[in-house]
């Protein structure tokens, strides 16, 4: 569920402890307990330290306790640097003595098989019984850099953020990635407030620490490495709070290359994998995704250093026509919007630039800056003052220390004391150029991130600017309950699915079910020729593969003959499939084939998939995911982002298609999924989209109902 498991006060006993017990303390070089104890002493932990080792009386000038039973009651946090077999009993003893939090380094739990999972569940039970926060097992520990609390077994570079400095909080399921990210940020002059590696998450997960970081006044951005969210609804609640608090969450989540499940019952199940579902749901909560660790650090830097997040419509100051062309290519590849600027719509720029330099975006000032370096200040200021522009990039040839010395001071001057509510980012175009550190530090001091390459800057800006284009409002309508759903279960064949969905306003062609040839002929006459005949059985997921679809039947005799042929085809395809009968349906005019499907994930909730469909849907995968919170206008915008969207708009003289009707269908299916958790999947494929004003028609329907 979405409820918080721990209060901030409970997490405080882990991340702001007043007392720490080191179980397995040592002075043996390389021992986990030795490094941990040395960290606490070296960085002058302000609270009480209680080393525990049955064979020692003193370590680093501290009294050593021989067993947990000797410890005072109510210690805030205990860190276990002991072998796995001793962990459970030790945790239980600590819980009984009122210890508030435990860090478990030891591996060999859920990742090690059935026995390890059993022990991990026992840890979870102890935590639940005593209200204890357990970090791990199989984790690197945690560090509060602000209050200098290093509860980790690796040597720590304790860089405490100066008072008033914006800092990032790290919540990572990988201890190594948490450490690497902190290491990557420090040379950039960026600070970490607190870092937590959650490991196997026996009793606390990343969502618990995000909740704490949202309320932490020393944290301004939250960076995450996540492999699997075990409590999605709780994380969504935490992400929603972070967005409301103005604290961006930047997440690196591997998994987009995972193969879809081949055994899925419908196209939708095969295509809407967990990664895509997760990303769709979290994007609506304001989460920003990175594709690489470097990109995670780059996005974090802009979010921390700049005075505001990038908006849509980027403007670029450049110094080369050739590089201007490359900028267009990079921007198009990553979906970054470059605002159009010209002499007519940008009078402020026109007044600044010499006659031989046209106003454009990127603005190419050529080598003018070497002789008139104040041009950098003037142009960048004009771009920042333009309300149409959401972010500005100085794309600069750095060359050498002398050239940098001419250019950098005039770029730094733009923000030195300025109050622009949009980011200015420096992007070198000559990665590897020798640039004195003092110039880079000067940029950073006034809030200008420095990137050695244009592409890195563009990608990070694109990820952040995308947030400004998202419709995060909850515009969901009332959930729709399907009458008669209690009478079906498992895979629901087409004819029954249409019987259930048609009364809700889902557009299907006229159709009738028939169990024998004469009934089929009578149905065809009632509907009106020509008709299509389709085999019907719960076990027949892909009718066309089995020869179970015959088109354009025009007479009673053709219908009777088709009935026999379909039964023969299906029997030849798979003798185990027993047909319920056939569906007789009116042949309608053809058009562009789309797919509309939906999935009710037991953890993430409902999501609707839509895009270009037909038998090639799983090959082309030109689809998008939509959530029930989106209204028809937001869905339309999403549909027009599909790769084949020009077809929807009208291509090569063809009419524009009824995207509005398709969007309404998607919204309706989303409301159906929201109102019926037992519907695991719906697949409408194909859905024919007709010219604008003529609507859509779902030609096939399949449902999966599970209770």
Curated annotation (Swiss-Prot):
ATP binds at residues 267, 524-535. Residues 498-549 form the ATP-grasp domain. Pfam families: ATP-grasp_5, CoA_binding_2, Succ_CoA_lig. The keyword Nucleotide-binding applies. Keywords: ATP-binding, Ligase, Nucleotide-binding. Optimum pH is 7.8. Optimum temperature is 37 degrees Celsius. It comes from the Bacteria. It catalyses: (E)-ferulate + ATP + CoA = (E)-feruloyl-CoA + ADP + phosphate. Its EC number is 6.2.1.34. The keyword ATP-binding applies. PROSITE patterns: ATP_GRASP. Catalyzes the activation of ferulate via CoA-thioesterification, a first enzymatic step for conversion of the lignin-derived ferulate into high value chemicals, such as vanillin and bioplastics. GO terms for molecular function: ATP binding; metal ion binding; trans-feruloyl-CoA synthase activity. InterPro entries: ATP-grasp (IPR011761), ATP_grasp_subdomain_1 (IPR013815), CoA-bd (IPR003781), NAD(P)-bd_dom_sf (IPR036291), Succ_CoA_lig_flav_dom (IPR032875), Succinyl-CoA_synth-like (IPR016102). Gene3D superfamilies: ATP-grasp fold, A domain, ATP-grasp fold, B domain, NAD(P)-binding Rossmann-like Domain, Succinyl-CoA synthetase domains. Homodimer. Catalyzes the formation of feruloyl-CoA, ADP and phosphate from ferulate, CoA and ATP. In the N-terminal section; belongs to the acetate CoA ligase alpha subunit family. This is Trans-feruloyl-CoA synthase FCS1.
């Amino acid at each position: 569920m979405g409820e918080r498991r721990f209060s901030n006060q409970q997490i405080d006993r882990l991340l702001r402890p007043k007392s720490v017990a080191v179980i397995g303390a040592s002075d043996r070089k390389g021992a986990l307990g030795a490094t941990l104890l040395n960290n606490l002493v070296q960085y002058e932990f302000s609270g009480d330290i209680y080393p525990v080792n049955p064979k020692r009386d003193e370590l680093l000038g501290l009294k050593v306790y021989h067993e947990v039973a000797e410890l005072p009651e109510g210690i805030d946090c205990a860190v276990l640097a002991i072998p796995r077999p001793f962990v459970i009993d030790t945790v239980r003893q600590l819980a009984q003595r009122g210890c508030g939090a435990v860090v478990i380094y030891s591996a060999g739990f859920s990742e090690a098989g059935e026995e390890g999972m059993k022990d991990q569940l026992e840890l979870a039970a102890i935590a639940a019984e005593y209200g204890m926060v357990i970090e791990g097992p199989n984790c690197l520990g945690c560090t509060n850099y602000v209050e200098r609390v290093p509860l980790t077994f690796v040597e720590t570079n304790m860089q405490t953020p100066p008072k008033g400095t914006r800092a990032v909080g790290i919540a990572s399921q990988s201890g190594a990635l948490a450490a690497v990210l902190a290491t990557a940020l420090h040379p950039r002059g960026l600070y970490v407030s607190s870092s937590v590696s959650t490991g196997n998450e026996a009793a606390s997960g990343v969502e618990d620490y995000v909740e704490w970081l949202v309320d932490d006044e020393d944290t301004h951005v939250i960076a995450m490495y996540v492999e699997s969210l075990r409590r999605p609804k709780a994380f969504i609640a935490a992400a929603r709070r972070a967005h409301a608090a103005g604290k961006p969450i930047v997440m690196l989540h591997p998994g987009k290359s995972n193969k879809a499940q081949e055994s899925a019952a419908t196209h939708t199940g095969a295509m809407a994998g967990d990664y895509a579902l997760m990303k769709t749901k979290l994007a609506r909560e304001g989460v920003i995704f990175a594709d690489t660790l470097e990109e995670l650090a780059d996005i974090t830097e802009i979010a921390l250093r700049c005075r505001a997040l990038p908006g849509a419509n980027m403007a670029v100051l450049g110094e080369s026509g050739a590089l201007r062309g490359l900028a267009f290519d990079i921007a198009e590849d990553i979906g970054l919007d470059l605002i159009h600027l010209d002499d007519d719509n940008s009078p402020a720029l026109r007044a600044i630039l010499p006659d031989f330099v046209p106003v454009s975006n990127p603005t190419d000032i050529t080598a003018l800056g070497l002789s008139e370096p104040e041009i950098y200040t003037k142009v960048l200021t004009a771009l920042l003052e333009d309300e149409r522009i959401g972010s500005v990039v100085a794309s600069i040839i750095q060359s050498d220390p002398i050239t940098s010395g001419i250019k950098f001071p005039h770029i730094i001057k733009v923000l030195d004391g300025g109050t622009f509510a949009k980011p200015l980012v420096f992007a070198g175009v000559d990665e590897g150029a020798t640039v004195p550190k003092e110039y880079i530090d000067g940029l950073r001091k006034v809030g200008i991130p420095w990137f050695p390459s244009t592409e890195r800057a563009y990608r990070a800006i694109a990820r952040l600017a995308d947030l400004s284009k998202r419709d995060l409002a909850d515009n969901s309508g009332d959930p729709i309950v399907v009458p008669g759903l209690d009478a079906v279960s498992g895979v629901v064949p087409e004819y029954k699915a249409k019987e259930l969905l048609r009364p809700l306003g889902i557009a299907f062609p006229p159709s009738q079910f028939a169990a024998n040839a004469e009934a089929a002929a009578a149905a065809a006459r009632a509907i009106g020729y020509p008709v299509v005949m389709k085999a019907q059985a719960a076990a027949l997921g892909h009718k066309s593969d089995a020869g179970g679809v015959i088109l354009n039947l025009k007479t009673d005799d053709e219908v009777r003959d088709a009935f026999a042929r379909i039964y023969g085809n299906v029997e030849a395809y798979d003798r185990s499939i027993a047909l319920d009968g056939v569906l007789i349906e009116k042949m309608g005019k053809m058009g562009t084939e789309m797919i509309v499907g939906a999935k009710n994930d037991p953890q993430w909730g409902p999501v609707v998939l839509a895009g270009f469909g037909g038998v090639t849907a799983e090959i082309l995968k030109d689809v998008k995911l939509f959530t029930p919170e989106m209204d028809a206008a937001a869905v339309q915008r999403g549909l027009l982002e599909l790769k084949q969207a020009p077809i929807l708009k009208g291509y090569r003289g063809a009419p524009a298609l009824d995207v509005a009707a398709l969007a309404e269908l998607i919204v309706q299916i989303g409301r159906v999924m929201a109102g019926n958790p037992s519907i695991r999947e719906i697949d409408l494929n194909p859905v024919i989209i007709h010219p604008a004003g003529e609507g859509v028609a779902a030609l096939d329907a399949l449902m999966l109902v599970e209770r």
